Amino acid sequence: MRILQLPALRDNYIYLLHDPETATAAVVDPTVAEPVLDKLAELGAELVAIFNTHHHHDHVGGNLQLLARYPRAVVYGSQADRGRIPGQTVELQAGETVAFAGRQAKVLFVPGHTRGHVAYYFPESGDLFCGDTLFAGGCGRLFEGTPEQMLGSLDQLRQLPEATRVWCAHEYTLNNLKFALTVDGDNPDLQARYQQVVALRQAGSPTVPSTIGEERRTNPFLRWDQPALRAATGAQDPVRVFARLRGMKDQF
């Protein structure tokens, strides 16, 4: 399974999963249809699945146009997003699996950013498509969920193997790390990562994917149990630490 990263709009990433052996493809969170259609034509591949992480328009905006061209494609999304994902044909629950290219992806229920957010984790290849729950160096805003829900979702992702590649849906890394330095500035891993990200962005290169290990070492939203983050927030309870961090980031 090849993973092709397609930039869209200002800072979105669409992910096209390609199986050369069967000339089929699946897409994760098609912001818009055009770059997906162009790449499918270039590859000579048929779209067989759309994996949506949540209902926001910049993640489902291309669904219907893709279905017009590939009407047999199956559209996956959370059961909690029923009626909110265009063209949805399969309603997923936590613990279910979906398949592509002979590989099984676990459906992880990760509410917080939205009430129905899911992530798709391919354990065999070590790839996580987490939408707007976990970002490189950050996490999604809480539009529909609670701090308790988001903390539980991030803790679930934090426990995945360190080598897991994190394919998040936005290029927010540089700003996320600028904020991280204000609350965890003495962290040498964070300092080094910031310099690497600055160089990547100056070169016009993506900073995604990262890894779970890298996020555990440098992402403040996965480090709520570290003394530096407790000190920065003036809290000890994990939910309070997280909630205060999220509030600080919202104002950053």
From Swiss-Prot:
Swiss-Prot/TrEMBL cofactor(s): Zn(2+)
Pfam families reported in the protein's UniProt record: HAGH_C, Lactamase_B
Binding-site residues, Zn(2+) 1: H54, H56, H113, D132
Catalytic activity: an S-(2-hydroxyacyl)glutathione + H2O = a 2-hydroxy carboxylate + glutathione + H(+)
Recorded superkingdom: Bacteria
Binding site for Zn(2+) 2: D58, H59, D132, H170
Comment on bound cofactor: Binds 2 Zn(2+) ions per subunit.
Functional pathway: Secondary metabolite metabolism; methylglyoxal degradation; (R)-lactate from methylglyoxal: step 2/2
Entry keyword annotation includes DNA repair: no
Gene3D superfamilies: Ribonuclease Z/Hydroxyacylglutathione hydrolase-like
Record InterPro entries: Clx_II_MBL, Glyoxalase_II_hydrolase, HAGH_C, Hydroxyacylglutathione_Hdrlase, Metallo-B-lactamas, RibonucZ/Hydroxyglut_hydro
GO BP, sorted A to Z: methylglyoxal catabolic process to D-lactate via S-lactoyl-glutathione
Keyword Zinc: yes
Broadest EC class assigned to this enzyme: hydrolase
EC numbers: 3.1.2.6
GO molecular function: hydroxyacylglutathione hydrolase activity; metal ion binding
Keywords: Hydrolase, Metal-binding, Zinc
Positions of transmembrane segments: none
CDD domains given in the database record: hydroxyacylglutathione_hydrolase_MBL-fold
Recorded family membership: Belongs to the metallo-beta-lactamase superfamily. Glyoxalase II family.
Function: Thiolesterase that catalyzes the hydrolysis of S-D-lactoyl-glutathione to form glutathione and D-lactic acid.
Subunit description: Monomer.
NCBIfam families from the UniProt entry: GSH_gloB
Protein name: Hydroxyacylglutathione hydrolase
